């Protein structure tokens, strides 16, 4: 049985775009053309580098629904707690992608469109442009939800948060963060009942392993058991991941200096094997700012037919 939207193929790289609340560059705003021009790694759509923080006039794509006062973290660039300082060193650690329950951001999503994942070379640097309007664009709030109190909480006692994996499905990925990885513990439906989904991975899948830097590669294979739409299921999922490029990603929110994580997701049920490719674009503090997912059984590493394109928006 195929669970649509399963795994990183719907997010972060379900990282669910969990960037940092309180990201600070530690300096004044300056003019920019690309994220690489900025100490924060962020060139906003108005052509100005930010400090990007919860109280900045420029706005922050990710806010805390808990309403904590994080102005001190933002101003000092403290990497502890909710703060984060981008250093644009082409290495992203877990501390530079703070993820927790209670964050939300706006993402703009289009489905079944043409987009060349290879991007373009501009002045000897790779550039991907997702700032333009795409056919069928829809804005949606992506949230990192608390697991405590949810109907599935007892199945995932070590979880950090849950988040929706895909615009085309209401299934939630249940994630755990650590200094070395972002792991998917399982997939659940938002509500319990006769048609509920509650699938657990053993061992957990790791779509992201830290630190991220060009050339890093890892593979995880997980067996999954549980219920999908009320039906018992057993299958396996394999994630082949590699940080294969660095460059500049243009989004409706602004331009970011990013590392691109290439993921080949193989879903096996009995003798039926489905392969899906995805690219996650990850940057300091914001985390996953865009994801491009292929159609099923795409054979090309760089593809042009995308099942879903999701990127951060104002």
Residue ranges, per PLM feature:
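Sec-dependent bacterial lipoprotein signal peptides
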Residues: 1-22
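Extracellular-facing segments of soluble proteins and assemblies that are Gly/Ser/Thr-biased and enriched
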Residues: 151-238, 243
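Secondary-structure transition/turn motif
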Residues: 48-56, 186-191, 294-298
């Amino acid at each position: 049985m195929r669970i649509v939207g399963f795994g990183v193929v719907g997010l972060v790289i379900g990282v669910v775009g969990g960037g940092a609340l309180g990201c600070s560059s530690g300096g004044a705003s300056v003019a920019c053309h690309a994220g690489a021009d900025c100490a924060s790694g962020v060139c906003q759509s108005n052509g100005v580098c930010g400090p990007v923080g919860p109280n900045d006039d420029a706005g922050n794509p990710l806010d805390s629904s808990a309403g904590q006062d994080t102005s001190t973290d933002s101003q000092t660039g403290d990497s502890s707690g909710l703060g984060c300082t981008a250093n644009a060193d082409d290495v992203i650690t877990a501390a530079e992608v703070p993820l927790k329950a209670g964050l939300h951001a706006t993402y703009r999503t289009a489905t079944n469109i043409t987009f060349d994942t290879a991007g373009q070379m501009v002045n000897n640097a790779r550039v991907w442009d997702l700032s333009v309007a795409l056919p069928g664009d829809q804005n949606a709030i992506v949230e990192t939800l608390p697991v405590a109190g949810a109907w599935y909480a007892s199945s995932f006692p070590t979880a950090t948060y849950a988040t929706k994996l895909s615009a085309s499905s209401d299934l939630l990925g249940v994630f755990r963060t650590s200094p070395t990885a972002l792991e998917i513990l399982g997939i659940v439906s938002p509500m319990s009942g006769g048609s509920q989904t509650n699938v657990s991975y053993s061992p957990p899948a790791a779509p992201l392993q830290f630190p991220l830097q060009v050339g890093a590669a890892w593979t995880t294979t997980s067996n999954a058991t549980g219920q999908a739409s009320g039906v018992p299921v057993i299958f396996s999922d394999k994630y082949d991941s590699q940080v294969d490029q660095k460059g500049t990603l243009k989004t409706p929110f602004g331009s970011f200096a990013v590392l691109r994580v290439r993921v080949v997701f193989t879903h096996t049920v009995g003798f039926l094997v489905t392969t899906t490719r995805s690219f996650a674009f990850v940057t300091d503090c914001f985390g996953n700012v865009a994801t491009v997912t292929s159609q099923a059984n795409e054979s090309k590493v760089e593809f042009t037919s995308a099942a879903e394109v999701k990127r951060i928006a104002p």
